[in-house]
């Protein structure tokens, strides 16, 4: 696949990680479609289109994202599925609503975007997908049952996509971060040392690597990005 002015769809683009990924990919010359429930801000120099009020738990919204990307740019080379969410809740105080919400926010959003983009990638026999899993996908910690289960499903989705489409030149990988250094996490954990956490810009660099030709032989992987946690 040519890396000349590639086009990437970034979901969850209004959040800290989404902004970091957009900035990094934009600096590499990517043209970007930035998607979120809220209107993503973009001040970079790259060619970018921002669209808010997109609910990726709805398949029709995901399909419209793909349609819009094709209309704006005439090609799609990569999808970075960042849209998601986290709830800390111990099981004794939890409810099925929490599990359903975590599934919708983390799994449905990724599934719907992958379902929407796969026909295009299969037709062009090439495409790159990076999903955001979590270190908790392999082992849940205190209060993270629903979140860990959802992120484990994202990792399994990634593995299946890679296995099913590798003969078509489609690569799917996931990154598995621990705690991201964001204002919300600093507020929630004031006694922790954020120097041990994962910088969104560092994680953006890993995502950019997975989208590059240097990672052409990496497929179906879950890449731990855990800082010093």
Language-model segments: residues:
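Substrate-binding pocket helix/loop in short-chain dehydrogenase/reductase
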Residues: 90-91, 95-103
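Residue(s) in the substrate-gating loop at a strand-loop-helix junction
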Residues: 134
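Active-site helix of classical SDR
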Residues: 114, 150
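Alpha-helical segment proximal to the catalytic Tyr-Lys
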Residues: 119, 163-164, 216
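Canonical Rossmann dinucleotide-binding motif of NAD(H)/NADP(H)-dependent dehydrogenases/reductases
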Residues: 2-32
């Amino acid at each position: 696949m040519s890396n000349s002015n590639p086009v990437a769809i970034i979901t969850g683009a209004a959040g800290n990680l989404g902004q970091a990924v957009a900035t990094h990919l934009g600096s590499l010359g990517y043209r970007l479609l930035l998607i979120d429930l809220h209107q993503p801000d973009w001040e970079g120099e790259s060619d970018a289109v921002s669209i808010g009020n997109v609910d990726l738990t709805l398949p029709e919204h995901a399909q419209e994202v793909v349609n819009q990307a094709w209309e704006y740019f005439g090609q799609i080379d990569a999808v970075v599925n960042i849209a998601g969410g986290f709830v800390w809740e111990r099981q004794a105080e939890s409810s099925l609503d929490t599990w359903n919400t975590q599934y919708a926010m983390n799994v449905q959003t990724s599934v719907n975007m992958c379902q929407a983009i796969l026909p295009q990638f299969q037709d062009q026999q090439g495409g790159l997908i990076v999903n955001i899993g979590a270190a908790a996908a392999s082992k849940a910690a205190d209060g993270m049952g629903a979140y860990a289960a959802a992120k484990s499903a994202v990792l399994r989705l990634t593995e299946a996509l890679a296995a099913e489409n590798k003969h078509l030149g489609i690569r799917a990988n996931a990154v598995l971060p621990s705690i991201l250094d964001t204002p919300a996490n600093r507020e929630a954990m004031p006694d922790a040392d954020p120097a041990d956490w994962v910088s969104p810009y560092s994680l953006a660099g890993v995502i950019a690597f997975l989208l590059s030709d240097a990672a052409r032989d990496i497929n179906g992987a879950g890449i731990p990005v855990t800082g010093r946690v």
